[in-house]
Each structure stands twice: as structure tokens, then as C-alpha cells.
Amino acid sequence: KAMASTTKIMTCILALEQREIKEVVTVSENAVRQLRVHLGMQIKEKFYLEDLLYSLMLESHNDSAVAIAEHVGGSVKEFAKMMNEKAAEIGCQKTYFITPNGLDASDENGKHTTTAEELAKIMRYCIQISPQKESFLKITQTQSHAFTDVDKKRQFSCNNHNAFLGMMDGALSGKTGFTGDAGYCYVGALRRGERTFIVALLGCGWPNNKGYKWKDTKKLMEYGLQNYEYHNVLKKQKNITIPVKNGVPSNGELFGEAVIEGRVKTNAKRLPFLIRQGETVDIKTEIPTMLQAPVPKGKVIGSVTYFLKDFQIQRYPVIVTETIKEKTFLWYLKKIFELYALK
């Protein structure tokens, strides 16, 4: 579905990761002609990137989004490419960005869309994984921000429209959105102790139902708090024995069979994950039935993956614990010579 201005969480985190916040952004004609809601920029006006990020996230200004995109990517099209690359890196497969502001758009490859699950993944990246997560949280938690253009000719002020920040203890971050295609949208995060919950809503009502997103967010957050707790889902895995074709056996016998052990490569003692009572975590082991010599010590030969239904929690590589050499022609020749020499 269309996601409207919730798009701007990706615009913000990309700008934070790619550029310095004190860089000067020069406004283009393309940015100026963006539809409302807008800051009201003027062509060739200059702003600090940091101030435009507050404009982007607090007031959801569409002209600021385009100015940021053009500064970071060189053009809106190139910035959208960066957005899609980052989305793929995060693990999104059904998200497609065309604009940096979330205005309804389509091109030869499809419409500007995402899913609620993938929007939540992007928010998780912004607040928990990105090297700029603290900067992202600082901006999105700020209640108001005043600034001027670089030349100090005009003054501006922005106020945070994320009502969720005042609705629940631990409310952490969020972004609203609305377009005709998207309806009212919201993505927000809450943290209580070690637990972090993210809610993503798409098409959550149309006018006159602006308040639905707040009610639904609170209801879903309360459900998460009441029903989900951290559990250590890590299971101790035994080493796996695998035959090695044409490998030199450990006893060195001419007709002996070589085997090798594979172990899960991790030093982790715990794998904490939020699950509901009654839910079970599945473990999928992918190991070949046979290896081909030579096999160097430490080679990755498979994986052990933890799943909750279709969601991948964690994947660990399986490596071999020793080196197995190949039975070469020279090795056979040497062995035959040794046999005859002993007679």
C-alpha cells in the first residue's frame, strides 16, 4: 500500500548516514514547487541540513524532503535509488520508493508502496541498528525547533505533530502520513525496559477518521506489552559429522573414509527474542550430506537458522573444525610405496 509521509523516516536516516548535518543545502526550483505541507522555501535559498531534517520530521514538509534528496543524491531519482538499495539491505522485498516525501507516485516499475511489516522493519533499522540511530531519535523526539536560513534573512519554527509521544510511557519515535491513496498512516515505536515495540499502520482511516491511528497504535502497543516477553531461544547445537569424498582419513589408511566435524560458529550464550506464550521457535539446519576434499579448516559449509513462523530471527554459519586434505595421485603413490616397503 501507499505509505504517505511515513516515507520520510527513510529520507531522514539516509541523510544522517550519508552527510554531515552542518552541510549547507541550496534550494532548487523543483523543491520550491512541492505541494503542501511545505516550509515555504525560495529558489536558491540556503539552509543547514540539520534544520531541514527537523522540518522534515516534525512538520513533514514536502519541499524540505526534496531539497534533502537533491543534496544527498544529486537528484530525486538518484536518491530514490539509494532509498531502494537501503530498503533491500534492511530486508524489504515489497517496498518501492519513488519520492522522498511520500506523495503518491508511480513510474514504469510500479507505485510508491510498502507493507506494514516492511515499514516496521525500516523503523527498527532507524532506531536500533543504524549508526545514526541516536541522531534520528533526537530529531523525532524534539517537541519544537526554531531556525533561520543560512543568511539569517528569515525565521522558521517547527512543532512535532506526533501525538503518540505524549500518549504512553516509553513512547520513543514515530512519523505520521496522509495522502489520498494512502489514507492515514503511522509508524511508531515504544520502549519499556529491554522491550521495544513497533507499530506500523497503513490505510488507517480516511477523513473524518484522523484519530483512528492513535487509538489503534495504543491498542496494539498495549497488546504487545501484555502478551510478549523476552525468552532465550538459543539451543545448544551438537557438532555434526560429515563424510568427505576423496579425503585423507585421520588414521591415514589407504582405503579409510574421511569424516569431518562441523560446528555452529557463535560465541553467543543467549539469543533473546520477544515471543508470546504458546509460540515456538523453529530451527532449520542446512548442511550438505557430503563434502569434496580438500576442505580447509574454518570453511563455512552450512547454516543454522532460527525462525518464528516465516520471520528469520538469526542465522549462524556452520564451519569445519579441521583441515581435510585430498587423496591425490602422489598421496596414493606414497601410500602404495609405504605398503611395499613394509613387506
Describe each PLM feature range.
Residues 1-134:
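Active-site-adjacent loops and short helices of periplasmic peptidoglycan-processing enzymes
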Residues 110-343:
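Domain-terminus/edge residues, biased toward the C-terminal soluble/receptor-binding domains
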